[in-house]
Amino acid sequence: EALDEFLRAGFRYGQGRTHYFIGPRKLYADGSLGARTAVLSMPYADAPQKRGVPIYPQETLNHLAAQSHRAGLPFIVHAIGDAAAESVLDAVEYARRAVPGTEQLRDGIVHCQITSRRTLERIMALGVDVYAQPVFLEYDLHICEARVGAALARTSYAWKTLLDGGVCVSAG
């Protein structure tokens, strides 16, 4: 409803100037690694009863992505866990199918910290931007392997891999 009202008022992506600019739509898919609320594809290694806390069911995330694309807005989503990132990628794929011609929108994942090899490959294939937050490395690198296990930790924080694969990765 809020997005529809915003659009009815005449606001559009790219409007504005130096101090005010209408940018992409940003949502959250999960929480944080430290609080064990980042959504993982497997149980937390140090808390097997937890897999994270998804913010939206997949159907809702798909709807929000398609709604963004219909409005001409890039869809960017906070996703720290690998399952959250996969969910965002599923939503982007859904929106691009539902709203043809929107592949040029600069959809993205904010954080993109815990990733599997499959997730990295999908990001590269879809050309989704990554808004990395390297400031969290100082804390997360001390807990990453304990939280997600050695195998998943090895393919996480793989921003250089994404850069080498042609993905636009920014710090911020």
PLM features: what roles do these ranges have?
Residues 14-15, 95-104:
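Short helix-capping segments at alpha-helix termini
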Residues 41-57, 108, 143-155:
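Glycine-rich tight-turn/loop motif centered on a GG-T
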Residues 76-80, 107-113:
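Catalytic beta/alpha-barrel core
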Residues 1-82, 86, 122-129, 134-135:
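Metal-coordinating catalytic core of metallo-dependent amide/deamination hydrolases
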Residues 67-76, 100-106, 166-170:
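Short, surface-exposed connector motifs at secondary-structure boundaries
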Residues 83-98:
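Short, electropositive alpha-helical surface patch
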Residues 10-12, 93-96, 127, 147-150:
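Short, hinge-like loop/turn segments at secondary-structure boundaries
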Residues 114-172:
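Active-site-adjacent C-terminal substructures of enzyme catalytic domains
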